[in-house]
Curated annotation (Swiss-Prot):
It comes from the Bacteria. PANTHER family: 3-OCTAPRENYL-4-HYDROXYBENZOATE CARBOXY-LYASE-RELATED, FERULIC ACID DECARBOXYLASE 1. Prenylated FMN binds at residues 175-177, 189-191, 194-195. It comes from Nitrosococcus oceani (strain ATCC 19707 / BCRC 17464 / JCM 30415 / NCIMB 11848 / C-107). Binds 1 prenylated FMN per subunit. The gene is ubiD. InterPro entries: UbiD, UbiD-like_C, UbiD-like_N, UbiD_bacteria, UbiD_Rift_dom. HAMAP family: UbiD (MF_01636). This is 3-octaprenyl-4-hydroxybenzoate carboxy-lyase. The keyword Flavoprotein applies. Its EC number is 4.1.1.98.
Length: 487
């Protein structure tokens, strides 16, 4: 099933019992978070708060609160089907050279489909049905959540931030949280290596002192939202990838005050600029780590214009100790990552990012070991191959007989197949998430890899133990006897 816009997706979820309308008044200050958190922990539906306190605009929460809804947003019926999305991305990232004309012809439709998914520019866009400018812009009219008691201000969480560097042909789209400072000012919290921050840095070098155009789309269609958080190859735009998921071109429209292009069906669009040197302290806010983050300076986004659809819906989320919505997204996207990694490292059998590890800080890899030191090659490959794993602090690599998703299995392997001195790889002074206060320096810390594989000659002088298993014939006889034993 494909969805042309957010409202189409909402209607489909509601028809399936996957969305619940909340008709009682609920306060965006803390109450929505508590309700969403309880429902998410129970694996419940997406929530549409129709009567947010102090505003007339409904709030959509927990949209991607189960892995299946993430898969549905990508146009798939099951989480398992996301492996096919990963295979497509793996192919587009590094296409295999055809071994003959037959293979070349088979690959041609894929490339044609990608080329056919270039975004379509439309002049008349739903996101510009209502236009507010200058003093009319007032973020207090949007029921922006304050998620936790220690949060300093309301926080925009699901904004798709659109930027364009001075020397780039293509726009960048990323999701960065934004602290509300006033009616038309928010703080743009992006880390230095992110696409938006790099565009801003390049702009300041090319146009010193001049305002940097920026746009934020809220409430885009699910394929576009998920395209912004998926490891799309650098050669493919997020909009083209969203088109592949949706099965139709992403419709964009030009901002009224700049050349930036935003999803035409978005519920709300914020247009404005960053002025070099205009910065403010951001935070503290409760984060996906389960802690409040440190206060840091980030640039201020001044909103000149706010456009929206008639009767707009505000799309929001909260972050906290896992499981939260980002953790659920991580569970689903885990299935997309696997084929991408296997394309580069065919020896990988499974790859798992436990949600309780903040969805990216710890990875468990199972592999078919082929030579001494092989596990160390794989762990180094995980850290370096995809930028999504730049902040993964712990990588556990073990054999294919271990279930990467069963902690009992993993811990048994760690305690029986590892020597701490021989099998730990520690790398110091590597990039670390700025939100990781456990690192000695902000943004810089260490990583550790655990070789939990059976050891080959050259890695050990000991005779390696053989796992205990019951004889299959005995197991079959006991199976046949079982019902008669009354056990």
């Amino acid at each position: 099933m494909k969805y042309k816009d957010l409202r189409d997706f909402i209607a489909k979820l509601e028809a399936e019992g996957e969305l619940k309308r909340i008709t009682v008044e609920v306060d965006p200050y803390l109450e929505m978070t508590e309700i969403c958190d309880r429902v998410l922990h129970a694996g419940g539906p997406a929530l549409l708060f129709e009567r947010p306190k102090g505003a007339s605009m409904p709030v959509l929460g927990n949209l991607f609160g189960t892995p299946r809804r993430v898969a549905q947003g990508m146009g798939e019926d099951s989480v398992a089907a996301l492996r096919e999305v990963g295979k497509l991305l793996a192919f587009l990232k590094e296409p295999d050279p055809p071994r003959g004309m037959k293979e070349a012809w088979r690959a041609l439709p894929i490339f044609k489909k990608v080329l056919d998914m270039a975004p379509k520019i439309v002049r008349s866009a739903p996101c510009q049905e209502v236009i507010l400018e200058g003093s009319q812009v007032d973020l207090s009219q949007i029921p922006i959540q304050t998620c936790w008691p220690g949060d300093i201000a309301p926080l925009i969480t699901w904004g798709l931030v659109v930027t364009k560097g001075p020397y780039k042909e293509r726009q960048n789209m990323g999701i960065y949280r934004q602290q509300v400072l006033g009616p038309n000012r928010v703080i743009m919290r992006w880390l230095a290596h992110r696409g938006g921050a790099l565009d801003f840095q390049a702009w300041q070098q090319a146009h010193p002192g001049k305002p940097f155009p920026i746009a934020v789309a809220l409430g885009a269609d699910p394929a576009t939202i998920l395209g912004a958080v998926t490891p799309v190859p650098d050669t493919l735009s997020e909009y083209a990838f969203a088109g592949l998921l949706r099965g139709s071109k992403t419709e964009l429209t030009r901002c009224l005050g700049s050349g930036l292009q935003v999803p035409a069906s978005a519920e709300i669009v914020l247009e404005g600029y960053l002025k070099p040197g205009d910065e403010a302290n951001e935070g503290p806010f409760g984060d996906h780590t389960g802690y409040y983050n440190e206060v840091e300076k980030f640039p201020v986004f001044t909103i000149e214009r706010l456009t929206h659809r008639r009767h707009p819906i505000y799309h929001s989320t909260y972050t906290g100790r896992p499981p939260d919505e980002p953790a659920v997204l991580g569970v689903a996207l885990n299935e997309v990552f696997i084929p991408i990694l296997q394309k580069q490292f065919p020896e990988i059998v499974d790859f798992y990012l436990p949600p309780e590890g903040c969805s990216y800080r710890l990875a468990v890899v199972t592999m078919r070991k082929q030579y001494p030191g092989h596990a160390k090659r794989v762990m180094l490959g995980v850290w370096s191959f995809l930028r999504q794993f730049m902040y993964t602090k712990f990588v556990i690599v073990t054999d294919e007989d271990i279930n990467a998703r069963d902690w009992k299995d993993v811990i048994w392997a760690m305690t029986t197949r590892m020597d701490p001195a021989r099998d730990c790889v520690i790398i110091e002074n590597t990039p670390i998430d700025y939100l990781d206060f456990a690192s000695p320096v902000s943004g810089l810390g260490s990583k550790i890899g655990f070789d939990v594989t059976h050891k080959w000659k050259g890695e050990t002088q000991r005779e390696w133990g053989q796992p205990i298993t019951m004889d299959n014939a005995v197991k079959k006889r006991v199976d046949e006897m079982w019902d008669g034993m009354g056990l």
